Every structure is written in C-alpha cells, then in structure tokens.
Amino acid sequence: MTDWNAARYHEISAPQQAWGRRVLERLPLTGTERVLDVGCGSGHLTAAIAERVPAGGVVGVDRSVAMLAQAADWLRTRSPRTHLVLADARALPFRRAFDAVFSGATFHWMDDHAALFRSIITALRPGGRLVAQCGGGPNLATLYGRAGRLMQEPRFARYFEEWTDPTYFADVDSTKRRLAAAGFVDIDVSLEPAPTTFDGPEQYREFIANVCLRHQGTRLPRPEWQTFLRELTVAAARDDPPFTLDYWRLNLAGRRPA
C-alpha cells in the first residue's frame, strides 16, 4: 500500500485540524504532563499539544513514514523537544509512560479497536486519561456509498478485486464495551454530525482524492482515477448544499484506574 502524500495532507487538512483543536480543549492539562499523540500525522496538532505542556513533553506516533517526515519538518522550529516514533497504535512500544493520550482523526483507519485500546491503556500511567475523536457511525455514508457503487461497475470493478475496506467506523455502544474491556473507567462516548462544505468542485475533488479515497486511488490507472473523481464531484454538485461531506465524529474518553 502506498504512503500518504503528507505534504498535500498538511495543506488541505483544515477540517481535521479544527476538530482536533476542539477535542484538545477537552483534555485537562496543567502544563507538566507527558502526552502521547496517537496518529500525529503531519504534526499540526502535535505542536498545539506541545504549546499546552511547556514543562512536560510530547511524543507523536504514526505508522506513516511520510507523515513522520512532514511532522519532523513542521516541528523542527516550533516544538523542537517533541519526539516522533514510527509505530502502529495497536502495538505501542510504551508502558506506563504517559499522563495523557490524545488522538484526532486516526482510529477509523484501524480495524482492531480492542487491541488499540489495550495498547493505549498500557502506555498510560495509572490515572492517565485518553481523549480522542475519529470517524464513527454513518461517517461519509453518502461519499462511500457512491464510491462503492462506482467500484462495482464493469469499467472499474477489475481494479478492485480482493478489495478490503481500509476504514472502520465504530458505533457508540461497541466503543464503550471495548474501552471497558481494556480496563478504562469514567468512559464517555458520543457521536456528533460534522458536515463539511467545500468552496467549489476543485477543493472538494482534491480533498476526497488525497484524504477520503486515497486508497481507492492507488488501485486505478490515472485516466480511470480522474474519471472516478470527476463523476463523484458531479454527483456532489447536485447535493444540497453542494460539495458537502457527511462527516460524523465519534468522541471518546476514558481513564486508566489509579
């Protein structure tokens, strides 16, 4: 599987940055904590965390080499004390190392949330908190429904043989159960709509190409990929409002017992 275009993601991920900053406001910090940013991506939110813990420390983890390289470049002068680690969040190389774990738009790219939550609670110190947000429930149902129907058409279907969906949008109840099974207490999980409208067809097309449908794009030759994107963009133009992605955000929080 090809890696992210981290530079483009860094430039166009304003929705993820805005959501992440609001989630960060729900994480109580005094300024001395050691914080783990799970799925740090290109480093925008990692830098925001570092600003809130001037006497603490921040470690960002991601399984994308390209994202970590972009994050290193972004953080070099902004948060030089931040450490970056290449790791899968379902098997973090930490034990009782952090006062808090934060994550933005990451968990929906992983299919084993039970393993994920076990890994995170192991990385937390007793009393440490998890505050996170990811796609959940009916997230992007309109876009992925349209894309799925196109993928089944004869002109595209041969490129998607043995296709495995890379996303997993958990619901509230299953997330509560998995957090509890991992050992978390004070669990709080909720789902909220976050429809996101783009200025026009170019902005919409670029976003879905580089974020939502990145994996589909790796399967298609360039001419077919351009056709695929064009047809989805034409469909989005007929929506009300046009060029809107039907995002849903799953908010989750929990604490490792003291």
Regions found by a protein language model. Give the residues of each.
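Core SAM-dependent methyltransferase catalytic element
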Residues: 206-208, 250-258
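Conserved class I S-adenosyl-L-methionine
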Residues: 1-33, 44-48, 67-70
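Helix-to-beta-strand junctions that scaffold the AdoMet/dcAdoMet cofactor pocket
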Residues: 110-111, 124-126
